Amino acid sequence: MKRFLIITALLTVNIFPQWNTGAIKLGYFNPSATEGGFIIGFEGGKHFDKYMSWNWSADWFHQNYVDKKLMNELNQFYPGANGELNELRASTNIHDFPIMLGVSARFPISKRAQFYATGSIGGEMLIVNYRNFQNPTNDEFEVAFDFNWRVGVGAAFAISPGSEFFGEITYHESHPSWTYEDNEFYYPNGVLERSYNMSGFMTRVGIRFFY
């Protein structure tokens, strides 16, 4: 009996580190810099306790939009310009790639349902295609970077012993930017920064698998 209890205890200790997870997330992201749109992501993780896990995630958000703030500034500083020309100048196409590491804590509601809270930090790459000011038919290309963080809450419902359906709402914070020199309006050359406020709320649903 004593040997059986020892073996059971050892197996119990070893079970938790073997709980790997993989999740696909789909939803809506509404950052301050752009119009809201579809976001897709993958999250992997590993349980180090029955109700605690570390995780990593990678997301992709794409938006093709007209930068209203920039267009208003162009209309203000260049009132004689054609409105359609300034709208073309403000046309922007972005691809956002946040990559994060985090920790999640679960709180059981019932045998099949759980509430959870999560927090993550990481880095972000923003690929930006925007219009050349002098010749708006030509595209300019830049890559912006920043650190980011994210906090959120969600609820999960088991649909089988190895999978669950979940929904969550999170707040994401980041301001990817790049610097450039302006030799037209500044002498000596002025070093300026262009920043995109990619902070905002996202709501997502998905399926998580345990293996």
Task: Outline where the language-model segments fall.
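Cleaved targeting-peptide boundary
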Residues: 18-26
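Extracellular loop and loop/strand-boundary signature of outer-membrane beta-barrel proteins
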Residues: 27-30, 85-91, 134-141, 188-194
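Membrane-embedded beta-strands of outer-membrane beta-barrel proteins
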Residues: 24, 40-42, 99-103, 117, ...
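Predominantly the C-terminal beta-signal and adjacent terminal strand-loop region
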Residues: 66-67, 151, 158-211
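Gram-negative (and chloroplast) outer-membrane scaffold detector with strong preference
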Residues: 46-134, 159-162, 198-211
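Residues that define the transmembrane beta-barrel architecture of outer-membrane proteins
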Residues: 20, 36-40, 93-99, 143-149, ...
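Sec-dependent N-terminal signal peptides
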Residues: 4-13
